[in-house]
């Protein structure tokens, strides 16, 4: 989509939605060349493309994206520390209640609110604060939301014995993390070379798992103290993480798409040059620049974006919003936060004396599995990873729930004190299998897909809505889990199993493959209405050669079982 013509934006969208629109596409005059077909070059001459280089050539951009992805560490750190805070004696004494025996405890309501209200803050922050990135740029946006996060941490760490002060602090820090969760993957997706975009966006999840792991380790290291050191060390380190995040923003390039949108074309070229390790005058870079600029100019024809545009079905934006909301919701409904938020509590119930150690093991498996995900997301594609991930996780939950129900809860709530080391060990093993499956597929894959899906004019809004759905389900799961497990205990696992079955079929029918495509090509694929299960075979119009069969994606002769277990 490297140009615009004199038709309206809606007319052009309709033209492009025809799957055979490669012929007769609009022509344009680009900034660096003569008039040419915007959707298809000469059938016998492949377009100039930025070359795929050895991974070693992308070291610089990988480091820069790692700095941006550090926002994931901040979120992971909160997840890892809060799961232990609610089991630390000083935290319970300060923010809990006394029972008739004079013992302090955290009620299910208070525990649920303290843990889960953070997600509400994140949902609001993602929707409201992501707009800062559209107005002032992604980098300034990330600095701003990180500053808001620091304010929330300051309120929490100064709490003495008022649980509602700590509660308010978590809401405010959640506002900041919600903004980070939208802007960080967004900026990475916009500066990363298309050949490794999925890998670099996956770094956000990798940093998140590192934060969870180190948060677990910090709780384990401070649990033997008998004062506020138990939990204030974990909170105090948040200031260091925020400082690192802000400092990193001084070195990373601004989004070339944002720069073009605000008329800073030369800066945009320098950003592309820095990301792709080529000269500013490289012909392939200039073609990439023209493609991005033309796509932005096309979007500008429709005027300023509004929230109501998210409901547009003609431009397939509503379909993308729905897909983003569903995929982010289903990520929570895999049941991952059942273990991450309440892992320490869960493994107490299976008879472990030091359940903090098991949480550290979860953190280790989660962290190192994420390194595998950095490779698999680009090697096998987004859809294949999600399909195999859902299938493997539902198998893990089937074993986890069945062992828990039959060995540790055979008589229901009337026998809650049953423990079994064998059953407990089995459940821990399959928990680790689950964490491995989640970390290598759904954990980062959802953020990759959502960051690649929306056209630039509504990208921040679309990503904010999709991410807000993730936070809202995170709130519901983290708040109601203590009540649900109190009523049905390990039967809860069957609920997540059912959600994973649904997730598998949803991905197969509604989530397209975006591996190897530029963001503009992803937009074209959506406009052409390519069925998700055929998207892996789709070729962008400008890359189609004379022997390309436009009807090929309409026919799939593979056996049904092969269709369901591949992209």
Swiss-Prot record:
Keywords of the record: Glycoprotein, Membrane, Repeat, Sugar transport, Transmembrane, Transmembrane helix, Transport
Location within or outside the cell: Membrane
UniProt region (Disordered), positions on chain: 1-45
Cytoplasmic side, ranges: 1-56, 134-139, 192-197, 254-336, 378-384, 451-467, 511-567
Biased composition (Polar residues): 1-22
Residues bearing attached sugar chains per UniProt: 87, 227
Membrane association type: Multi-pass membrane protein
Transmembrane feature ranges: 57-77, 113-133, 140-160, 171-191, 198-218, 233-253, 337-353, 360-377, 385-405, 430-450, 468-488, 490-510
Alphabetical GO biological process terms: carbohydrate transport; hexose transmembrane transport; xylitol transmembrane transport
Record-level Gene Ontology MF annotations: carbohydrate:proton symporter activity; D-glucose transmembrane transporter activity; fructose transmembrane transporter activity; galactose transmembrane transporter activity; mannose transmembrane transporter activity
Cellular component terms (Gene Ontology): cell periphery; plasma membrane
Keyword Repeat carried by entry: yes
Superkingdom of the organism of origin: Eukaryota
Extracellular side: 78-112, 161-170, 219-232, 354-359, 406-429, 489
InterPro entries in alphabetical order: MFS_dom, MFS_sugar_transport-like, MFS_Sugar_Transporters, MFS_trans_sf, Sugar/inositol_transpt, Sugar_transporter_CS
Function, in words: Probable glucose transporter.
PANTHER family, sorted: GALACTOSE TRANSPORTER-RELATED (PTHR48022:SF75), PLASTIDIC GLUCOSE TRANSPORTER 4 (PTHR48022)
NCBIfam families listed in its UniProt record: SP (TIGR00879)
Protein known as: Hexose transporter HXT11
Species of provenance: Saccharomyces cerevisiae (strain ATCC 204508 / S288c) (Baker's yeast)
Gene that this sequence comes from: HXT11
């Amino acid at each position: 989509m490297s140009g615009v013509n004199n038709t309206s934006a809606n007319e052009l969208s309709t033209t492009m939605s025809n799957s055979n629109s490669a012929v007769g596409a609009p022509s344009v005059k680009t900034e660096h060349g003569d008039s040419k077909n915007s959707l298809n070059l000469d059938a016998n001459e492949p377009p100039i493309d930025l070359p795929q280089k050895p991974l070693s050539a992308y070291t610089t951009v990988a480091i820069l994206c790692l700095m941006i992805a550090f926002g994931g560490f901040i979120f992971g750190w909160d997840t890892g520390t809060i799961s232990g805070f609610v089991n630390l004696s000083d935290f319970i004494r300060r923010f809990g209640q006394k029972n008739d025996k004079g013992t302090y405890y955290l009620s299910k309501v208070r525990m649920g609110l303290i843990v889960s209200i953070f997600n509400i803050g994140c949902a609001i922050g993602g929707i409201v604060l992501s707009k800062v990135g559209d107005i002032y740029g992604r980098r300034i946006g990330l600095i701003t939301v990180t500053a808001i996060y620091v304010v929330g941490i300051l309120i929490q760490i100064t709490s003495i014995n008022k649980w509602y002060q700590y509660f308010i602090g978590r809401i405010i820090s959640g506002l900041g993390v919600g903004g980070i969760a939208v802007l960080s993957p967004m900026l990475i997706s916009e500066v990363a070379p298309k050949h490794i975009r999925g890998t670099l966006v996956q770094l956000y999840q990798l940093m998140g798992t590192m934060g969870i792991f180190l948060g677990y380790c910090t709780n384990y290291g401070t649990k033997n103290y008998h004062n506020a050191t138990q939990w204030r060390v974990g909170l105090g380190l948040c200031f260091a993480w925020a400082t690192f995040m802000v400092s990193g923003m001084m070195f990373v390039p601004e989004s070339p798409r944002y720069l073009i949108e605000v008329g800073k074309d030369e800066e945009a070229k320098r950003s592309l040059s820095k990301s792709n390790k080529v000269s500013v005058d490289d012909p392939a870079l200039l073609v990439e620049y023209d493609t991005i600029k033309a796509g932005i100019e096309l979007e500008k024809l429709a005027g300023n974006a509004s929230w109501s545009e998210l409901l547009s079905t003609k431009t397939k934006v509503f379909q993308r919003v729905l897909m983003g909301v569903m995929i982010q919701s289903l990520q929570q409904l895999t049941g991952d936060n059942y273990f991450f938020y309440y892992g320490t509590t869960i493994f107490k119930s299976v008879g472990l004396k030091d359940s903090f150690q098991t949480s550290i093991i979860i953190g280790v498996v989660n962290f190192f599995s994420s390194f595998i995900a950095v490779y698999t997301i680009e090697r096998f594609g987004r859809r294949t990873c999600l399909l195999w991930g859902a299938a493997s996780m539902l198998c893990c939950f089937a074993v986890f729930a069945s062992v828990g129900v039959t060995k540790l809860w055979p008589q229901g709530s009337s026998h809650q004190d049953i423990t079994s080391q064998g059953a407990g060990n089995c459940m821990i093993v399959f928990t680790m299998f689950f964490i491995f499956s989640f970390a290598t597929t759904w954990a980062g894959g959802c953020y990759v897909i959502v960051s690649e899906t929306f056209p630039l004019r509504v990208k921040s809004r679309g990503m904010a809505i999709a991410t807000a759905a993730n936070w809202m389900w995170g709130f519901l799961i983290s708040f109601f889990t203590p009540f649900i497990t109190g009523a049905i205990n390990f039967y809860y696992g069957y609920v997540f199993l059912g959600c994973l079955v649904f997730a598998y079929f949803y991905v197969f029918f509604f989530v397209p493959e975006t591996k190897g495509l530029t963001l503009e090509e992803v937009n074209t694929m959506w406009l052409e209405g390519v069925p998700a299960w055929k998207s892996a075979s789709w070729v962008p119009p400008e890359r189609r050669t004379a022997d390309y069969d436009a009807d090929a994606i309409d026919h799939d002769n593979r056996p049904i079982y092969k269709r369901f277990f591949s992209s």
